[in-house]
Amino acid sequence: MTIQTKEKFFYASGAVANGVKNDAFTFFLLFFYSNVIGLAPGLASLAIFIALLVDAFTDPIMGVISDRTNHRLGRRHPYFLLGIIPMGLSYFMLFSIQLSWDLSQQYLFLWMLTFTIFTRLGMTIFEVPHRSLGSEMSRSYTERTSIFAAREMFGWAGGLFNAFLAYTIFFKDTPEYIPGTQNPEPWIYYGMTGAVLMSISVLVTYFGTLKYRNTSSNDQISFDLKLIFSQIFIALKNKSFLIFFFGYLFIAVSWGLNSSLQIYMNTYFWEFKSIMIASFLGIYVLSTFSAFLLVPRLVLFLEKRSILLFAITLAALIPPIPIVLYLNDILPDSGSWNLFFALAPFIYVANTCLSSSAIVRESMLGDISDEVELESRIGQQGLMYASSSLIGKLNTGLGILVAGLALEFIGFPQGSEVLPNAHQIFSLAMVQGPFVAVLMIIPFGIFSFYKIDRQKHKNIMSQLEAR
C-alpha cells in the first residue's frame, strides 16, 4: 500500500514533540541548571545518569507492552494520549524553578532529577509506539526510508522552532544579560511554550494516523514479566540489532557531547550574540531539508550502510576544522558577522550528514525488525524502536552526563557571575571539537559490519510473505 503525502505528514508531525524535548535537553538543560540556577555540573550529570537508568528499564518494557497490546484503538495509539500529561507537565515544571527560591544544592538536584525522569517517562510512553507505527505503515525498503526521512525532518523542525523562539523571543540580549540565556526570568515561559508545542504535536499525529491503528502482524496479545524479558533476549541474539544498538550508542555519546557543549562554545569561545545564534537556525533548516530530499534518492541506488558510513565520516571530520582554523588566526574575530559566515558552510555540511545518518538509521531498524520477525516468528517493532528511543535519549542524557563531567574536569565555573579563563575556554574547545571527532571512529567501525542490504531484505520479505 502506497503511503499518501498527507499521511506521512500526520505521522511525521509527532516527531515535533521529541524534537522540542531533545533541543531543550541537549542545548539548554545543563546550561540552565549550571549557569543560571547554580547547580553544580557534577550533580546535574548525576541526575541525568539516574534518569538514564530508569530509561534503560522502561523503554524496552514499553516496547514489548505496546507490541502485546490489544485495544480497539490498536496497539500504538492508546499510548499517544497516555503520554501527553506526564510529558508536558513535567517538562514545564523542569524549567519553572526560580533562582529567587534560593534552594540548596540538594533540593535543586532533587527537582531536576524528578522532572527529568517524568518528562522522559512521558516521552517513552508516546515515542516508542510512535516510532513502531512508522515501521508498520510500510515494509518497502525504499518507502520506509521516505517515511522516516519525513519524521526526521519534522523532528529537526520542532527542535529548530523551539530554538528560534528561545533566541528571538525568550532570551534576547539585554544590557543586564549578554547573552540573554543568562537571564533567569524567561525560562518558565520557555518551558511553558515547549510543553504546549509537544502536546499539540501528539494530538495531531494521533488523529491524523488513526487509519493505521490496526496495522499489525502479531496475533499474540497476552504478556507477563517473563515474556517481556524473553522478547528482549530474542532481540539481543540478533547480530544486526546488536550492531545497530552499539553503533548508534557511540554516535549518541559522541554527538550528544558535542551538542551539549554547543551553547558554551557559542557563548564563551565564539562569543556570538543571541541574534547570531538564532541566525544559525536558518542553516540548520536548510541542511535538514537537504537531507530530507537527498537520502530517499540516494537509497534508490546506494546501500544504506554506505550512506551511513559516509555521513558518519564527514560528521566527524568537519566540526573540528573551524576550531583549528580559528586557533591559528585564520578565521575572522570572535563575535563578528564575518566569523558567522565563515562557520556557516561547516555547520551546513556537518548537520546535513548528521540528519542523513539519522534518517538511514531509523530505516535500517525497520529492516532489522523484519529480520528478527523472520527468525523469531514474532513481530517486535515496538521493542526494536524502543531501543532507538532509548538511544535517542542517550544522545541527550549521556551527552549532558559527559559534558557535565568534562566541565567539572576542566574547572569550568558555575553560575552566571563568574567568567571562565582562557585556559578553560581552550579546554572546552578541545573537548567539543577534536575529542568528539576521535570518538566518532568507534561507530564507524561498528556499522562497517552491518550486513542487511537490498537483496538480503528482499529475501527476508519473500520468506515472511510465504508463511
Which sequence ranges carry the predicted segments?
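Membrane-embedded alpha-helical bundles of multi-pass transporters/translocases
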Residues: M1-R467
